[in-house]
Amino acid sequence: MSAIVDIIGREILDSRGNPTVECDVLLESGTMGRAAVPSGASTGSREAIELRDGEAGRYNGKGVLKAVEHINTEISEAIMGLDASEQAFLDKTLLELDGTDNKSRLGANAMLAVSMAVAKAAAEEAGLPLYRYFGGSGAMQLPVPMMNIVNGGAHANNSLDIQEFMIVPVSQPTFREALRCGAEVFHALKKILSDRGMSTAVGDEGGFAPNFGSNDECLSTILQAIEKAGYRAGEDVLLALDCAASEFYHDGKYQLAGEGLQLSSAEFTDYLATLADKFPIVSIEDGMHEGDWDGWKLLTERLGKKVQLVGDDLFVTNTRILKEGIEKGIANSILIKINQIGTLTETFAAIEMAKRAGYTAVISHRSGETEDSTIADIAVGLNAGQIKTGSLSRSDRISKYNQLLRIEEDLGDIASYPGKSAFYNLR
């Protein structure tokens, strides 16, 4: 038995300089697991609640001392002595202790930090790398990365309404080569922007944040960078978007302020379809407002066979909402953010539900990150096939890519890189 003998919660800082929660879990054998939780900028209204102190004079109200106190008191008392290898039972204990539907009492940030730290301690106790502990002998597939090389929307202070413009390397034989491709395109784009006298400052997720005249101009420039780096757009490298449409949906219209457009759901579907026809776009995330299910249905019927349609704010890693979406034929993919739901057990359940329905599951970071690289191990352990963890800059993003390189090395000859086949939801 891997009994839990000590739990320590603490307040640390994330990549935006805001407080977040870190937790250490110590086992009877002396083994320790440490985990830190991320935080989002654009959030779904039905996400599990991240507990903040609200004390205006300290970190602008964003302190997490209440969540830390819950770890060091109530949660510690409830799980002390439990077997760390019994993840499902431990997470069930946390859920029952919280007692709310949205984890608002203890805080999803407190619960997730403990859930992750326990898993890490148990993996260490078992002498297994974390991805192997999660997935057993079947964990051998590296994920295709969606690399956010231009930031807009809530992630940057520029004129772009769409939040993320991503490159997706798909023709490479290994993850290592896919990562090299992404880095080379990133540097080619930096040179193009610099030559034009445009900003090469980066946003929250490490992508550039220049002022383009339109989304079309941004995508065209990315195609130039792909070519400049020596790759073929549409063959070696595909494109992906995160619209984060809930952020610019007001008064029943999709208001693209950067382009002076106010569009209905049908008109915005036409807008996205035009982009998908013009550019090699393989994936669009949150293409409609989270509450605009009629719009989502229209978008899915229009593009769902040729473009991966990812629900982030739509599904918030929640199996109850995902089940409803599957039944109604909404989207064909789910974004998986561990802090949207608050425990590893619930996270894994969402991934499995998606797969059973023929939906893909894209493992994702948040805009406020830490050096914790657990999502890399989840992506491989659960054979998710896709990961979204930022650009090719900022160590809070690179830490996940570097962990995937280590995992690929550890797997050796049995490692596989799915490329285009990661998009099995497209027919």
Swiss-Prot record:
PANTHER family: ENOLASE. Its main location: cytoplasm. It is an enzyme of class 4 (lyase). Mg(2+) binds at residues 242, 285, 312. Transmembrane segments: none annotated. It is found in: Cytoplasm; Secreted; Cell surface. Its EC number is 4.2.1.11. (2R)-2-phosphoglycerate binds at residues 163, 337, 366-367, 388. GO terms for cellular component: cell surface; extracellular region; phosphopyruvate hydratase complex. Belongs to the enolase family. Gene3D superfamilies: Enolase-like C-terminal domain, Enolase-like, N-terminal domain. It catalyses: (2R)-2-phosphoglycerate = phosphoenolpyruvate + H2O. CDD domains: enolase. Pfam families: Enolase_C, Enolase_N. Keywords: Cytoplasm, Glycolysis, Lyase, Magnesium, Metal-binding, Secreted. The gene is eno. HAMAP family: Enolase. SUPFAM superfamilies: Enolase C-terminal domain-like (SSF51604), Enolase N-terminal domain-like (SSF54826). One of its GO terms (molecular function) is magnesium ion binding. Binds a second Mg(2+) ion via substrate during catalysis. It comes from the Bacteria. This is Enolase. Catalyzes the reversible conversion of 2-phosphoglycerate (2-PG) into phosphoenolpyruvate (PEP). It is essential for the degradation of carbohydrates via glycolysis. Pathway: Carbohydrate degradation; glycolysis; pyruvate from D-glyceraldehyde 3-phosphate: step 4/5. The keyword Methyltransferase does not apply. Its cofactor is Mg(2+).
